[in-house]
Regions:
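A short alpha-helical cap/connector motif
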Residues: 1-114, 121-141, 145-181
Length: 181
């Protein structure tokens, strides 16, 4: 997969969102993901917010050794994403879960090197699952932190108060490194 294919998929995702007035925003700071995936040699990734599949495709393009589990509740987006991954030849790297994250997360048992939340502002109920699913020294990347709340709400404050994470903010994205279990 080359950069032109990823660019086309990104533009398609933007156009789809505009035409359908849906919440499937493509993540605009993918270079942040590349930085943390390559610097930590992340191989097992959990994504919340599949949309049309752009971000999973971007992450899969970094290395054929990367495997992504992705969750989205929109069945139409799931079909579009699956089709996009098949066209790009990365469908074997991505496992898709259709359903609300609140329903899917409790059933997940894998431990992830990196978790990428790209839905609306995250709820506190996700943090417990993230702590369980993220390995020690794993990276939790949360986009759209300020979508509903300029301060990032309770989730951001909980990360700041927690002694389990070292964190920082880049644009609207929070990066948190899990220091211990």
């Amino acid at each position: 997969m080359n950069e032109d294919e990823l660019k086309r998929l990104f533009l398609y995702a933007k156009k789809h969102r505009e035409e359908h007035a849906c919440g499937g925003y493509p993540y605009e700071h993918a270079e942040i993901l590349r930085l943390f995936i390559t610097s930590t040699s992340a191989k097992k990734i959990l994504e919340l917010g599949t949309g049309t599949g752009y971000t999973a495709a971007y992450m899969a393009s970094i290395s054929s050794d990367i495997h992504i589990d992705t969750i989205d509740q929109d069945e139409d987006h799931g079909k579009i994403a699956q089709s996009n991954w098949e066209k790009l030849g990365i469908d074997q790297q991505v496992r898709q879960y259709l359903g609300k994250a609140e329903s899917v997360l409790p059933g997940l048992r894998d431990i992830y090197d990196l978790i990428f939340f790209d839905g609306y502002s995250p709820s506190m109920k996700f943090l417990t699952h993230f702590e369980r699913l993220l390995k020690k020294n794993g990276i939790l990347i949360t986009a759209n932190m300020f979508l509903k709340d300029e301060l990032g709400g309770k989730y951001m404050r909980a990360l700041q108060r927690s002694n389990r994470y070292q964190m920082g903010v880049i644009e609207d994205t929070t990066i948190a490194i899990k220091l211990f279990d």
